[in-house]
Amino acid sequence: MKFSAAAVLAAAAGAHAWSNVTYTTEIVTAVTTYCPGPTEITHGGNTYTVTEATTLTISDCPCTVTKPIITTSSVICHSCTGYVNSTIPAPTSAGSVGTGSAPAVVTPTVSPSEVPTAGAGKAAALSGAGLVGVLGLAAILL
């Protein structure tokens, strides 16, 4: 009984982690797609055969196109201090022969870089799945 309750809980949590996708539906007068190789596409009862790489336009519409809305979060820090790369060799002066002053030393400046956050949602989903697995294991052992 404990195992079946844990299995149901794990399945529900897994389904919930992937069910928060929002879709948008649009009715268009034509659909254009790129086919990289030979294929067959069935749309609205019609079959379109592509024999080589081509751009295919389906114009016997209205056609309903449903797409997921994908959101991406990113962080850009404009006030962060830059990272000084210590592997850049220090600028040197060749010196001059004769009179005059030595050339000015140029110090390289480094601009701040963007913080990569691509895939953070996937990591969050996987950590939730890991937590469900640990809870399931605890339920089995109890």
From Swiss-Prot:
UniProt-listed InterPro entries: Sed1/Spi1 (IPR038843)
One CC-aspect GO term: fungal-type cell wall
Any single GO BP term: fungal-type cell wall organization
Protein name as annotated: Clock-controlled protein 6
UniProt GO MF annotations: structural constituent of cell wall
Gene designation per UniProt: ccg-6
Induction line: Expression levels may be influenced by circadian rhythms.
Similarity-based family: Belongs to the SED1 family.
